[in-house]
Amino acid sequence: MKLDGYTRLAAVVANPIKHSISPFIHNRAFEATATNGAYVAWEIEASDLVETVANIRRYQMFGINLSMPYKEQVIPYLDKLSDEARLIGAVNTVVNENGNLIGYNTDGKGFFKCLPSFTISGKKMTLLGAGGAAKSILAQAILDGVSQISVFVRSVSMEKTRPYLDKLQEQTGFKVDLCALEYVSELQARIAESDLLVNATSVGMDGQSSPVPENIVLPETLLVADIIYQPFETPFLKWARSQGNPAVNGLGMLLYQAAEAFQLWTGKEMPTEEIWQSLTEKYQ
């Protein structure tokens, strides 16, 4: 990697963030595309967020990525938001356009790009969970022309989830169906008519648990996706594959959301296939 007076910085900003795989991905991409850039991880306190955003202009950076807890907190300090960032209410990428700071959310785009030969337009989706990742997948699906979405959360989370779905409907005219995860017969019925089933919860990170009961029967053509990539094969994905369904883990989402950010910063395509090889070697 070349570092000189012309090197431009990009960074991921969060707390905690030292474990992040983003520097690995982006520095590989800078190198592979002969871009004079360097990508670092900044673990900051909330009180330093304003100054951190100011540094994007001050040091003429490409921009920054954001992770928890700053995806929403950063919004007041930006000049403009993209459509999907406005819908989601969260930003994971800030682009420095000649001193203008524009907030994007590439998570949803990254998720749909990682699905093998699948487009969401005109399709039906069942989504488990309603946290940050789920919101980005939801909003992107609506922007991309999904025909129906069923969101399942635990009954204790229904009240907390509804206002966001109401806001989405207000902004897009699209009504998302909200259901309780405990109603297994409803879950089975919705999955039976879906084209895509997504686990956007953290259930399965322990390598033991699954967000759905194992007696659920999956339709043959259903594509199953999990946003988790550690473990590489969650119990949820193992269960889907045991029924003969194609199943995708969350590593592709991580890579393709990074590729979207990289393109916004540099105007260049990230060599995703090459980086995918390195990532799978690292995590498989």
Curated annotation (Swiss-Prot):
It catalyses: shikimate + NADP(+) = 3-dehydroshikimate + NADPH + H(+). It comes from Streptococcus pneumoniae serotype 4 (strain ATCC BAA-334 / TIGR4). Belongs to the shikimate dehydrogenase family. Shikimate binds at residues 20-22, 67, 92, 107, 229. Involved in the biosynthesis of the chorismate, which leads to the biosynthesis of aromatic amino acids. Catalyzes the reversible NADPH linked reduction of 3-dehydroshikimate (DHSA) to yield shikimate (SA). This is Shikimate dehydrogenase (NADP(+)). NADP(+) binds at residues 83, 129-133, 227, 250. PANTHER family: BIFUNCTIONAL 3-DEHYDROQUINATE DEHYDRATASE_SHIKIMATE DEHYDROGENASE, CHLOROPLASTIC (PTHR21089:SF1), SHIKIMATE DEHYDROGENASE (PTHR21089). It comes from the Bacteria. Homodimer. Its EC number is 1.1.1.25. One of its GO terms (molecular function) is shikimate 3-dehydrogenase (NADP+) activity. GO terms for biological process: amino acid biosynthetic process; aromatic amino acid family biosynthetic process; chorismate biosynthetic process; shikimate metabolic process. The active site is at 71 (proton acceptor). Pathway: Metabolic intermediate biosynthesis; chorismate biosynthesis; chorismate from D-erythrose 4-phosphate and phosphoenolpyruvate: step 4/7. Signal peptide: none annotated. It is an enzyme of class 1 (oxidoreductase). Keywords: Amino-acid biosynthesis, Aromatic amino acid biosynthesis, NADP, Oxidoreductase.
